[in-house]
Amino acid sequence: MEKNLYIVCGHSNAGKTNFLKEAVKLFKEKGITLGGVIAPGVWDGDEKTGIDSILFPSEELVHLAVRKPDFSEGYSRKWKFDEKLMDKINKHLGDLSNCDYVMIDEIGPLEIIKKQGFTNALKIIETAKFDNVIVAIRPSLVERLKDMAHKDYKITLIEVDKNPDINILL
């Protein structure tokens, strides 16, 4: 069976998570089993005030991060992350099995550059444990992610700003 790595890329607030939410709906309609995590923003009007995470397949909702009132420089400069929940999500990713698709929203500099955060997400990509993996990432990190991906993966780049057809994932 062919192994697929779908890289969903776009800048901050470009629609990566919305694309993944549409994929979740599609997979439910088709009876496709999904594991992983999506991270929708928490909004107060036009202001993003936090980040939630929804764990699949259970659909458990956890509140991952809140905006820092006066953020400093660094990889997660805008957000104060709950470290216990980061660990919980990382463990969840490491414990996944029997999924048609694994979804990871998102892998960022913390994982790719610092090798911290959701390190089990990187293991999924490096080992080709699953046949179909969907990863959200910013454009500046795409080439690094491709370099890390297991050689058995066929890589498909999905740029959300080009309004891709959700069925590309099937």
Predicted regions and their residues:
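Phosphate-binding/switch loop-helix module in NTP-utilizing enzymes
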Residues: 70-113, 117-123
